[in-house]
Amino acid sequence: MPAYYATSQPSSRGYIPLIVESHQGRPTKVEGNPSYLPYGGSTDIYSQASVLDLYDPDRAQGSFSRQSLKSGVNRWKKVSTSSILESLTEEVSNGKVALLANHSHSLTRQSLIQKAKAKGIKFFEHDVVDYCSAERQLGKALGAKLGMRAVPKLGSAKRVLSLDNDFLGNREANELANSKSFMGGRKVLNPGDAKKMNRLYVVEADLSRTGGVADHRLRLDSSAMTAFASLVAAELLSKTKAADGALLTHLKKLGAGAKEHQAWASETVADLLSRPKQSVVLAGSHLPKEVQLLAYAMNRALGSIGQTIDYIETNHTDGSIDSLAKLVKDGEIERLIILGGNPVYHTKGFINWEELSKKLKYVVRLGSSIDESSQI
């Protein structure tokens, strides 16, 4: 008989509540937890594929301790987990300890990290793809102490302008909630519902899932996205009187590179302004901070903040993996705990881990495989 349990899968951009089916203690199927209404029981491709990791033939089968032989070859000896925890407790008490992990929105992990930092342990994060760059840039530009994440409330939006933001695909955060809330505004059960539908304008470099359902789509090179955003912002901020003359002149100058799309931009702005507080402008997380700021300014001018979009503060760490490497070189970090990921492999092009490992007195790696990061 199958058994079921509730869990969640944290990631760098959020977490997904799950229901896992298991047989004889082995998970066999992953589905979304229907009790979490924003996602409606849906999952993403990564959650569905995660069960395969449990059956990876290269998955580590226990705890190991590295022993360096005189020949220079490393040999792995299987040891008890309790012995590793005992040595870890002793080493942590000596100070100069750092934690290195992937970015995660796990609330439990955040709580534990705060307790560790209270004892003087430094915390660093690294991801192969930095999805949080736009959040940090926007937060810095707005004078916030932390990063600022744009969280659209598409269930309340009647007009949406997407600037290379695939909010229905897996390129942006919160895509499951976005899909459920946005598509809820496109249901037509009778002829009268057509007038109540939301309307989507998409400007993008390639065909995305979001572009596939757009009412109006403009194909535009990513290199021209800043110019187009400036073009739209100049007209919208001018009509709402939300910017002074000097700024508008500067925006028009920047938007000259997209002047051929002036008619498209003007029609879009007119439609956005026809639904104040029910319109929203979304910028792709990969776009530069100038576009992020322009999207914020347009949402503020539309009265959308708090209505169709929220800006929330995100957590932060003591620094990047580069700052960690510098602290190790300077002798300020002597003990390193690596939580998941494979940072040694992903950063070997710009961090000399062989040199750093000579300065580290103690390294513990928590992971599912014996890989490059385990070798240090």
Where does each model-flagged region fall?
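Phosphate/diphosphate-binding loops
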Residues: S12-G14, S179, M183, L200, ...
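Active-site phosphate/pyrophosphate-binding segments
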Residues: G143-A144, H216-K329
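Short beta-strand/loop segments at the ligand-binding rim of alpha/beta enzyme cores
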Residues: V188-V202, E334-R335, L356-R365
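N-terminal export/assembly segments and adjacent metallocofactor-ligating motifs
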Residues: M1-A227, L231-E260, S266
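Short acidic, S/G/P-rich loop/turn micro-motifs used as interaction or catalytic elements
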Residues: H105-L107, D166-N170, L287-P288, G341-T347
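Extracytoplasmic/secreted cell-surface and envelope-processing proteins
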Residues: S133, N170-E172, T210, E290-V291, ...
